[in-house]
């Protein structure tokens, strides 16, 4: 709750209105926060502006003679209450609906990744107990990707057709069920474990296309990268939460503890999401007209006003080089990301001989900084676009940072002599890789706004294949060569090659 003192009226519209000059309140106003005093006065948003204080006073005096209440008005993009020279003694703000949407989306992304990480940590005691080799450990780690690869394309098409709300609700419910069944499957048989993890991946495949499509509908262009950055910050924080909580629960409760916890949180999220979110802002019963105008500003065509069209042919999509730039970027991003996600605890334990809890702490630090840097990458992208830089140049700058930085860091990781030094290089690699969120991940909405879910599914399908190869390949490389160095070097040069392709062929202009 904020309190402001006596203020002079702001006569820039058809009424005598008081607008708080507190800079914090003003900033909230520009973001679309609604003042409670505005709701009580039932302010009309359609009033025209008037150039002088006297003009506003004359019109209000005329209204009083007609026994009508003086008009109150809405400043551009924000409602204000009060009237005449009355001071606003107390201002309470109500959170914009789009902020609620991005917070719930970030929570979903946090659960999405935490559920993956639980297995990355729990697999270490399982491997010791069941006698798995490094190569078979890679098979188990990659098993969720077997289902993920199929749901990426299907999930993207479903999101384009039905919207992100319903698809996400079903996806989270099903992957929470699979998470709950994982310890039972591990105790039953290896085959059952692989099947449950594949089903888990099948359900999780809808998360990314749903997130990008939903946020593109709820946020204006100059806020979209920040919204994705916040959601992906939640995604990366899922790594931190999973890496820190899982060892504690494994030691105190057992294998089933962390799986039951995160499955329960997922089902709780579904109940909240289903009752509080709509696919499009104009369908929300809670959104204000001022916030809706702010969202729609700069959007020449709204998704809800477009008649549904069939997805373009795969041949047409693949005939354009910007599509291939996105596909190769997704392949490289997933290759490097899943190597670190699946093998980081194992890396610290085998290379530096630290215990599981210490390995989890060293692994958590890079993901925590990635969550923070991802938000700032999105904010920087939005700032560059607002200040006149072309979307194409911004996407190329962000993606170049997101690939060149990790490539150089992984090469340096080969020379790390202590777990602390290795954690620093991994932190730099993952922090800079988060700039990809403002690169290829947003570029799908740029080149194909009507088919972004379908395009995301296609590129994510290729990226999932790369993740399977890299996750399994790391295990074989380690088993054959006895170290991680060779595979880290291969991954670094893949980052460099994809950066060149991206700079040559990526675009921020609409293609489809």
Curated annotation (Swiss-Prot):
InterPro entries, A to Z: MFS, MFS_dom, MFS_Na/Anion_cotransporter, MFS_trans_sf, SLC17A9-like
Coiled coil: none
Keywords tagged on the record: Chloroplast, Membrane, Plastid, Transit peptide, Transmembrane, Transmembrane helix
Entry-linked SUPFAM superfamilies: MFS general substrate transporter
Topology in the lipid bilayer: Multi-pass membrane protein
Extent of the transit peptide: 1-44
Localisation: Plastid, Chloroplast membrane
Record field: transmembrane: 102-124, 139-159, 167-187, 191-211, 228-248, 250-270, 324-344, 359-379, 396-416, 422-442, 462-482, 486-506
Reported induction: Expressed with a circadian rhythm showing a peak during dark (under long day conditions).
Gene Ontology cellular-component terms listed: chloroplast membrane; plastid
Tissue-wise expression: Expressed in roots.
GO function terms (MF aspect): phosphate transmembrane transporter activity
Protein origin, superkingdom: Eukaryota
Assigned protein family: Belongs to the major facilitator superfamily. Sodium/anion cotransporter (TC 2.A.1.14) family.
Function: Inorganic phosphate and probable anion transporter.
Name the record gives this protein: Probable anion transporter 3, chloroplastic
Lineage: Eukaryota, Viridiplantae, Streptophyta, Embryophyta, Tracheophyta
């Amino acid at each position: 709750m904020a309190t402001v003192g006596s203020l002079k009226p702001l006569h820039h519209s058809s009424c005598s209105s008081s607008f708080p000059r507190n800079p914090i309140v003003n900033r909230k106003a520009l973001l679309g926060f609604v003042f409670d005093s505005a709701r009580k006065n039932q302010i009309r948003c359609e009033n025209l502006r008037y150039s002088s204080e006297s003009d506003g006073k004359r019109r209000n005096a005329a209204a009083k003679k007609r026994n009508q209440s003086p008009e109150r008005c809405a400043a551009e993009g924000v409602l204000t209450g009060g009237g005449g020279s009355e001071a606003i003694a107390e201002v309470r703000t109500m959170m914009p609906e789009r902020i609620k949407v991005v917070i719930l989306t970030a929570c979903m992304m946090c659960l999405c990744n935490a559920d993956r990480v639980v297995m990355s940590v729990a697999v270490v005691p399982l491997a010791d107990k069941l006698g798995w080799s490094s190569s078979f450990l890679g098979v188990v780690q990659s098993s969720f990707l077997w289902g993920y690869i199929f749901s990426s394309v299907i999930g993207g098409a479903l999101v384009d057709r039905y919207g992100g709300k319903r698809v996400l609700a079903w996806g989270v419910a099903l992957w929470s069920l699979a998470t709950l069944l994982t310890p039972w499957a591990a105790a039953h048989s290896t085959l059952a474990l692989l099947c449950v993890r594949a089903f888990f991946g099948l359900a999780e495949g809808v998360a990314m296309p749903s997130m990008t499509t939903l946020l593109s509908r709820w946020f204006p262009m100059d806020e979209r990268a920040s919204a994705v950055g916040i959601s992906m910050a939640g995604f990366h924080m899922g790594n931190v939460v999973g890496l820190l909580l899982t060892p504690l629960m494994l030691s105190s409760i057992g294998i089933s503890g962390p799986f039951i916890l995160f499955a329960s949180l997922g089902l709780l999220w579904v109940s909240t999401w289903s009752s509080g979110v709509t696919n499009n802002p104009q369908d929300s019963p809670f959104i204000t007209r001022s916030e809706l105008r702010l969202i729609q500003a700069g959007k020449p065509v709204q998704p809800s006003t477009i008649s549904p069209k069939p997805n373009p042919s795969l041949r047409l999509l693949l005939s354009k080089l910007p599509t291939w730039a996105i596909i190769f970027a997704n392949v490289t991003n997933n290759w490097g990301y899943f190597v670190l996600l699946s093998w980081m605890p194992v890396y610290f334990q085998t290379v530096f001989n630290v215990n599981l809890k210490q390995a989890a702490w060293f692994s958590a630090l890079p993901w925590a900084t990635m969550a923070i840097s991802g938000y700032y990458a999105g904010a920087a992208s939005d700032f560059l676009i607002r200040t006149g830089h072309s979307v194409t140049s911004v996407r190329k700058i962000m993606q170049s940072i997101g690939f060149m930085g990790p490539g150089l860091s992984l090469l340096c990781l080969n020379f790390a002599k202590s777990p602390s030094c290795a954690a620093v290089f991994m932190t730099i690699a993952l922090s800079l890789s988060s700039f990809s969120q403002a690169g290829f991940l947003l570029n799908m909405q740029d080149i194909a706004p009507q088919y972004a879910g379908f395009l995301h599914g296609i590129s994510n399908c290729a990226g999932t294949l790369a993740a399977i190869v890299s996750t399994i390949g790391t295990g074989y490389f380690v088993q054959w060569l006895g170290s991680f160095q060779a595979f880290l070097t291969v991954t670094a040069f893949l980052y460099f090659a994809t950066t060149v392709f991206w700079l040559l062929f990526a675009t921020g202009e609409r293609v489809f």
